[in-house]
Every structure is written in C-alpha cells, then in structure tokens.
C-alpha cells in the first residue's frame, strides 16, 4: 500500500455562538475518516479554524461592549475546548483573522483580478441611517412582498417560502436599530463566475465529485450546455465591517465567504510553518497531494462552485473531492431550544455523558449520502448499551480476569491460531473499504457481527465454568486467550471511532498503539496483560433526561438575561392605533389541531390540519417547525385567523393563519409560542 499525502478540512464554525451536537456530526464524521487514514500510514493533516469575520460578529461584540477580537478570542477558546472534549483531532485549529489568511486572500484576489475575473459595479442596498451601515439580508425585516406576512427576513419568507431581494420588502426596518432603511448605492466587487472559462472548468470538474446528489445539484446550477445560468458573486462589503480590506479599495472589505474557505489554507500554512512542511508543494496546481472538504449540504453551493473556481484561476490545486452530509434531527424533529433538544457540546460534557457514546452513535447512522441523520434518544441509549457495553467491552470483562488470576496475564500463544481469528482478519479489507468510502454504518454493522461471533465463542466455551475444574485449565487458558486476541482485533476496527477507549485497551493489553498493520500481529505471552478495569459504563436514561432539562434551563436563562434598557423585557414597538371596527374585521377562531406533519423541502414549515367547527377541516402552513415537533401539537387547541383569504403557497393552499408569539429579535430572545386556549374552549369559538 503506497503512502498518500492527504489534507482534510471541515467547515469553519462561526465565531459568534457555541458548538452544538448538530455541528458535531460533521467534525466527528471527518475525524473518524482522518484517524482511519492515519492508522493506514498515510501522511494526513486535518486543519480547521474559527470563521471570525462579518457583520454578526461585529454587532455582537458591540452589544457585549467588547472588541470583535476580544469576542473571537473567547469563542475560539470555547470551540477548541468542545472539539478537544469530543476527541476531534485537529493537527491545527486556527482563526481566519490571521496574517496568513490576509496574505492568502490578497494573493487569490490579485490573481483573479489579473485573470480578468474581477468586476466593479454599482449596487443599490438598504442602508441604516442610524447605525450608518449597509444591512445584510438577515438584518432587514419587513412584510413579504408575496403573501404580506410581517417580520420576514430580507431574503426569504418563512410563511410562504418565497425568495426575493431585500429591496422588495414592504415596510422594511433594520433589525439592528429599528430604523426605516433607505436605499443607497455603492461600488461592489464581483468574482465573474459567469465567465465562460469558469463554466467550462466547472462542467469538467463536476465529474470528479463522489456523491451523485452533489453532481446532480451542480448540474442543476450549471444548467444545460450552452445556457448561462451562473451568477457573478459579490465578494465585497462596505465599512463598517470586521474583516480584511480589499487591496486598492479603501473602505471595501472581503465578504466573509471569500476569506472563510481561504482560511483552510491559512490554517494549513500556519501548520506548515510549525512542522517545516512545504506549503506550496501541497496547494500548487501540480501538487500530487489529495485535498478533501467535509461540509454540510447547505453550503454545497459555495464549495462546489465558488471555491474550486477561485482556486483554479488563482494558481492553486482544486479539491480532490467535497463530501457533504445531511442535517441532524433529534427524535425525528428539528433541534428545538424549547424542547431541550438544541444540545450544546458543553452541556453534553457537563451532564456527564461520554463523548464516545455520541461518536459511536453518529458513526452507526452515517453513510456516504446527504440524507439527514436522526438522533433518536431511546435508540441512542439502547444501541450504546447493547453494542459497546453488551457486545464489545463485555468480551474483555468476561475473560481478562481469569487470564490475570490463573496465568499471570500471559496468553497461550498456540491457541491464537483458532479459526475465529481467520474470520476476524478476513473482514479487514471490507471494513477498510467502508471506512474509506465513509460508509461508517455499514462498517459498524460488520464489526458488530464479528463481535457477535466472538461472544458466541465465549458463550460456547463458558470460561466461568471451565474455571471451576482444574482439569480444564488448558482449555480455560486457550478460551481466554482467543477471546482477548479477538477483542484486540475488534479494537483495531473501532479505534477511529473510540480513540480514548482503545487507548485504555492498549494500556490494559500492554501493547503498542494499534494501527491497521496490527491486524497481522497478535498478543504475545512475552507481554502479560494488566489487570482489567471497567472500560465503559452504560448510558442511564436519567442522564439523557438531565441533558434535555439542562438545555431547557439554558434557554430560559438566556431569555431572562435579555432586559431592555429600563430593566423590563425588551418588546418591539406597539403598532399604530386602530378602530374597533378594524379589529372586528378579523375573525379569530379556536381551532383543534387534528393532524400535523413536517413539510418536505422546508426546514421552517409545518402543515396543520385544523378543525374550526365547520364540519370540515382546513389546511394551514405555519413557520413553527423550529419550536414544535408535529406529534406534540396533535390534539391541542390553538387560535387562527379564520377569514384570511386562502393563498397559494409553494407547498400547497393555506386556508388561514395560526397565531404565535415571538420576540422582535429572535436571536437575542429565542422562542416561538403558539396560542393555546384554556380548558373548556371548543373548536369554532370566536375570540373577541
């Protein structure tokens, strides 16, 4: 097997919030693959960094009364702690706010400019006259230009699913200051992705992608041969902005989505300086090294269009492949702060749960596709307890004690030629291939089938019975030796997923650190094992319940900690006064939710079937998926606007509107709450 040179990255977490278990899916997926490559003997480097630039970081720092750099330094420490706790083995974890990143961003930009791929244009945007800043899409709210829903963001409507330009919003306001924004023009810098050179390159490059879903999506974005469907990419932002100023353009800054992926290279360049590696030999056009990016499917567009085109035309190698994964749900629903399933990495550790439990469970669910992954908490408990404790660790616990007490910890060398060893070793190529292809769930099914075979062997030999009869001493010695050698081989296969547990196994077995070549070795009587101590405890449901409660309490603490300037809860300004006749036009009715389901293709909408006492049901779409699991709403009473004209939406006809309460600034005061009448109310009652 020839040695490969491999550079691996995961997406960079944004430096204005904590790491949660949804993030951890990606870092665990990447780390398993990286650890496997290292075990195979390949020169592999895994780098990451905090994504530190942009308006949200600048505004959050201002809100906290600190500088952006003070904020990103604190968040970096928190993120690094979380990755260390979950055994994510970065070779270098850095920051996009670095000298290396500034230098590389300027180099890429100037090369693109030299190639004629940078254009300057006037762009009209919303401008906050109070904060004296241009407003990103997500910092503008207003009425949807399609359905009229209030408090919708500047790029899409959570009610009807429409997408639009911020300047299309009706009655817009700044989320930052509350002021009415004005339209203002400024010069912006664009990467000309629509250039025929980019299109030709991308059509060729798309054939290298490993995932059919990614290839199909890219071909959809590229359109048919001869079509011009690619849009140029705005790579600049106006001051004030926390980031890198564009060379030769005072007051203009690189958009965060330009400097963030370049941050992969900046982190690696920093590592190269520490290790004495030749950076250019890894990233130049003619490099023979491999380069892989693990990402979420929501940022596939940036990593399969902009990023490879930027690299290609700035004199760098392009990615060998981009691997995208799906989103995490918990118990079949989107992670929810109100249900306690929006679980932070730190809360998981603080509650006393073993990070390797989650590493194993995610691995048992992960494959090479972009399909979403569900953390079913009951299944999590059952699978960890069954597979890791009941099957894997149980092998050592049932045999090691006899070997230490009766045979000074020394195995019977001759017994290790047992046919069971052949079965375990013959599986190595298949397991290696599955790890390589990121088919972790299939790899673990194979490993657990082998564990079943080993446990069946132990059950047949019954060392606990053999130990009662001195005449069976040799048979006892052989049985325990075979069981522990099989356990060692299983440990090799599980090491990419359970690095901490396997490190303790290596110490207990008194062996060198396991790598893939160790499959061809075996335990030796010349190196006696150490006394056995427990390697892993079972998951207790009380721990999981405590974790959910801790995250519910964290939400409440966040809400309680957001006061207005006068010490009372912050609320948005009251609407203009209306006459009683205006209110009388609105027909509010009590409605019973008789059915509810998530809307395929939307991560915001739920589809509700409502009984409003008419003898028939109504279909209503509501943007409350982030707060409620469908099954939790069925049977509840709520309040709806019953005389709202039906409107055709992307996903079907909506025949009313369910009322829900939320704060004006949902990021500062998270939470979404449907109205629920007291007991005694019945469907069809009018709210007056």
Curated annotation (Swiss-Prot):
Residues 582-688 form the tRNA-binding domain. Its EC number is 6.1.1.10. One of its GO terms (cellular component) is cytosol. Keywords: Aminoacyl-tRNA synthetase, ATP-binding, Cytoplasm, Ligase, Metal-binding, Nucleotide-binding, Protein biosynthesis, RNA-binding, tRNA-binding, Zinc. It catalyses: tRNA(Met) + L-methionine + ATP = L-methionyl-tRNA(Met) + AMP + diphosphate. Homodimer. Binds 1 zinc ion per subunit. It is an enzyme of class 6 (ligase). Zn(2+) binds at residues 144, 147, 157, 160. GO terms for molecular function: ATP binding; metal ion binding; methionine-tRNA ligase activity; tRNA binding. Belongs to the class-I aminoacyl-tRNA synthetase family. MetG type 1 subfamily. This is Methionine--tRNA ligase. A motif ('KMSKS' region) lies at residues 334-338. A motif ('HIGH' region) lies at residues 13-23. One of its GO terms (biological process) is methionyl-tRNA aminoacylation. Pfam families: Anticodon_3 (PF19303), tRNA-synt_1g (PF09334), tRNA_bind (PF01588). Its cofactor is Zn(2+). Is required not only for elongation of protein synthesis but also for the initiation of all mRNA translation through initiator tRNA(fMet) aminoacylation. The keyword Ligase applies.
């Amino acid at each position: 097997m020839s040695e490969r040179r491999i550079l691996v990255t995961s997406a960079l977490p944004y430096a204005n919030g904590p790491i949660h278990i949804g993030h951890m899916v990606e870092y665990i997926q990447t780390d398993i693959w990286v650890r496997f490559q290292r075990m195979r003997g390949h020169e592999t480097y895994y780098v990451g960094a905090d994504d530190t630039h942009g308006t949200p970081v600048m505004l959050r720092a201002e809100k906290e009364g600190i500088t952006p750099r003070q904020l990103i330094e604190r968040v970096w420490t928190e993120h690094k702690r979380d990755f260390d706790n979950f055994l994510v083995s970065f070779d270098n974890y850095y920051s996009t706010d670095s000298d290396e990143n500034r230098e590389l961003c300027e180099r890429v930009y100037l090369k693109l400019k030299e190639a004629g791929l940078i254009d300057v244009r006037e762009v009209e945007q919303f401008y906050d006259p109070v904060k004296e800043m241009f407003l990103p899409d997500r910092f503008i709210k207003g009425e949807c230009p399609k359905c009229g829903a209030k408090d919708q963001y500047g790029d899409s409507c959570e009610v009807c699913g429409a997408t639009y330009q911020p300047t299309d919003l009706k009655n817009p306001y700044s989320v930052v200051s509350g002021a009415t924004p004005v339209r203002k023009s400024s010069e912006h810098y664009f990467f000309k992705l629509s250039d025929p050179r980019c299109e030709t390159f991308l059509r060729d490059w798309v054939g290298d992608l490993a995932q059919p879903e990614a290839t199909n999506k890219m071909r959809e974005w590229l359109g048919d041969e001869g079509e011009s469907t690619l849009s140029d990419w705005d790579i600049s932002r106006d001051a004030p902005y926390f980031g890198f100023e564009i060379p030769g353009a005072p007051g203009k800054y690189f958009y965060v989505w330009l400097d963030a992926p370049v941050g992969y290279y900046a982190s690696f360049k920093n590592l190269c300086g520490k290790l004495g590696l030749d950076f250019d030999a890894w990233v130049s056009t003619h490099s023979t090294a491999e380069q892989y990016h693990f990402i979420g499917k929501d940022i596939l567009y940036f990593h399969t269009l902009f990023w490879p085109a930027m690299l290609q035309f700035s004199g760098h190698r392009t990615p060998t492949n981009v691997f995208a994964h799906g989103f995490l749900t918990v118990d079949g629903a989107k992670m929810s702060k109100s249900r306690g399933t929006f679980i932070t990495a730190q809360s998981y550790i603080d509650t006393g749960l073993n990070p390797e439990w989650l590493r194993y469970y995610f691995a048992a669910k992960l494959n090479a596709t972009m399909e979403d992954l569900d953390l079913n908490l009951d299944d999590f408990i059952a699978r960890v307890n069954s597979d890791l404790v009941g099957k894997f660790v149980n092998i050592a616990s049932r045999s090691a004690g006899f070997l230490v007490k009766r045979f000074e910890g020394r195995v019977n060398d001759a017994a290790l030629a047992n046919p069971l060893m052949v079965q375990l070793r013959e599986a190595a190529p298949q397991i290696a291939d599955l790890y390589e292809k990121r088919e972790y769930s299939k790899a673990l099914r194979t490993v657990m089938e082998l564990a079943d075979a080993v446990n069946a062997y132990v059950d047949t030999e019954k060392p606990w019975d053999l130990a009662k009869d001195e005449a069976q001493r040799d048979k006892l010695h052989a049985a325990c030796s075979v069981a522990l050698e099989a356990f060692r081989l299983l440990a090799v296969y599980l090491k990419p997923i359970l690095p901490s547990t396997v490190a303790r196994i290596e110490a207990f077995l008194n062996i060198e650190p396991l790598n893939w070549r160790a499959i061809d070795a075996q335990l030796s009587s010349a190196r006696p094992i150490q006394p056995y101590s427990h390697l892993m405890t079972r998951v207790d449901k009380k721990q999981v319940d405590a974790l959910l409660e801790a995250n519910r309490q964290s939400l409440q603490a966040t809400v309680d900690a957001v006061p207005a300037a006068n010490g009372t809860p912050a609320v948005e300004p009251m609407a203009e006064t209306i006459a009683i006749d205006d209110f009388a036009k609105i027909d509010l009715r009590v409605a019973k939710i008789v059915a509810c389901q998530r809307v395929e293709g939307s991560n915001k909408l739920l589809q509700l079937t409502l009984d409003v006492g008419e003898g028939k049901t109504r279909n209503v779409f509501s943007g409350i998926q982030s707060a409620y699991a469908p099954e939790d709403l069925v049977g509840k009473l709520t309040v709806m606007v019953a005389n709202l004209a039906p409107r055709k939406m992307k996903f079907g006809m909506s025949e009313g509107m369910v009322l829900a309460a939320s704060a004006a600034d949902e990021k500062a005061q998270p939470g979404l709450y449907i109205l629920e009448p007291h007991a005694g109310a019945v469907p069809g009652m009018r709210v007056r």
